[in-house]
Amino acid sequence: TPIHHYMGCSTFSNYTVLPEIAVAKVREDAPFDKICYIGCGVTTGIGAVINTAKVEIGAKAVVFGLGGIGLNVLQGLRLAGADMIIGVDLNNDKKEMAEHFGMTHFINPKEIEGSVVQEIVNLTKTPFDQIGGADYSFDATGNVKVMRDALECTHRGWGQSIIIGVAPAGAEISTRPFQLVTGRVWKGTAFG
């Protein structure tokens, strides 16, 4: 019987061979409905912050998409000591849970005038930084337009945009070269 993989991972089989580093021992009494998230959402979200972006204390960050992975990016940002943590989602019902995970500001792109990029740039300006822009952004949507917005809302000179979301097969992302020439960085990550 063939085993169909998603990103090289399989769990719907009677036996699976994997490296020791990929195994985590859990207590026998650990509730499966809670620990089942550890294998992807938690490690992917927190790992993107800690391992891929290496977010530092005091950073300004944006998370696009507040589902399971996005919430854990928020949690990772809180653990890393980010000061401003902006969540972006089309669903206002996600705001309360996102605040619980560490979000400090919420933007629903359907409820603002103008672009979400300009909204974030304006929100991150300070008296000492009139350019604005997030130090870090994270895409947890898999939407290529959102991936572009995530890059373009980061700060000129040092902004990093981390792509976590998986786009549809064959999809392409694009931006103006100026966005990268001015010091922004696009990175991808899988499983944190």
How should these model regions be labeled?
Residues 63-66, 78-149, 170:
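Adenosine-nucleotide cofactor-binding segment
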Residues 1-64:
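NAD(P)H dinucleotide-binding glycine-rich loop of Rossmann-like/cofactor-binding domains
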